[in-house]
Amino acid sequence: IAFKETQKFSQWWLWLILLFIGALPILGIYKQLIIGEKFGDKPMSDLGLIIFAVFVFSLIAMFWFMQLKTEIDQNEIRMRFFPLVKKRVSWEEIKNAEIVNYGFVGGWGIRLSTKYGTVYNMKGDKGLAIELLNGKNFLIGTQKPNELIAMLEKISVKNTK
């Protein structure tokens, strides 16, 4: 493997928001199920509160386990946006691959862009823009643009020999 990178959502402000959101069902369950006071002006049923808590904690767990993993070697590019997307593209299918500063594409995660196609990113604004021979495009965000540039130069030299 010539290049390997694993990214996770590590923005402090995101986890602060998720912590606040996660505190709401805990407070609701404590107040309504343990103390016996209704939680809010129009309280949910106990079952509804439990279902809401499971949903919120599942969402937080998804953010915790979500990762963008990129592996590149002389044969192919492998990208996995766990747990949602897995993609493998051989170099023979690629028309062009370059490091770009893609700017803000409406947030992080999986985004659609008119310029880059599907954008897979966790943070930042730099990525590997890939144009396929079939006309489709996608972009993989990176926090290691310099390593990726060096690797692309090595791969292109090997592929031209």
Tell me the role of every PLM-derived stretch.
Residues 9, 79-142:
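Non-transmembrane, membrane-adjacent beta-strand/coil modules in membrane-associated proteins
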Residues 51-63, 110-112, 117-120:
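Short, solvent-exposed secondary-structure boundary motifs
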Residues 40-52:
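Hydrophobic alpha-helical transmembrane segments
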